[in-house]
UniProtKB/Swiss-Prot annotation:
Residues 97-141 are annotated as: Disordered. It comes from Pseudomonas syringae pv. tomato (strain ATCC BAA-871 / DC3000). GO terms for biological process: translation. GO terms for cellular component: cytosolic small ribosomal subunit. This is Small ribosomal subunit protein bS6. It comes from the Bacteria. Pfam families: Ribosomal_S6 (PF01250). SUPFAM superfamilies: Ribosomal protein S6 (SSF54995). The gene is rpsF. Keywords: Ribonucleoprotein, Ribosomal protein, RNA-binding, rRNA-binding.
Length: 141
């Protein structure tokens, strides 16, 4: 069996069906003796260019080990499913199980956002109320 990285884009109006689609595709691979090494749902994202006047899509990425027969059936499912607006299948030399760069970047972005939104401790705890009353207005004294 060979290793593949599969990315497919689902029409944004069909985003609620993504879970069922992923379940159906993973079942198809596993029933043929294949294995899912990584599954990432990247969610709804902006497209680089419009596809059929659609500017956003729901992205899903799979790293699988499967037979050529299962892959052909999966590609047929993509081709005849109107909700899948694009798909890409890349043959890999080995199984990839770590997080993708896309998911790592998203987590880093959310961590930075949390740190930014976290309230800083106030300076009033040291007795300074911020009115600068102890600073002289006259600089040449």
């Amino acid at each position: 069996m060979r290793h593949y990285e599969i990315i497919f884009l689902v029409h944004p109006d069909q985003s609620e069906q993504v879970g069922g689609m992923v379940e159906r595709y993973t079942k198809l691979i596993e029933e043929d003796g294949g294995k899912i090494h990584r599954l990432e749902d990247w969610g709804r994202r902006q497209l680089a260019y419009a596809i059929n006047n659609v500017h956003k899509a729901h992205y899903v990425m799979l790293n699988v080990e499967c037979t050529g027969k299962a892959l052909a059936e999966l590609e047929d499912n993509f081709r005849y499913n109107d909700a899948v607006i694009r798909n890409l299948v890349i043959r890999r030399d080995e199984a990839v199980t770590g997080q993708s760069e896309m998911l790592k970047a998203e987590e880093n972005r959310s961590e930075r956002r949390e740190r930014r939104d976290r309230p800083e401790h106030s300076d009033s705890a040291d007795g300074d109320d911020g009115d600068n009353s102890d600073v002289s207005d006259n600089a040449d004294e």
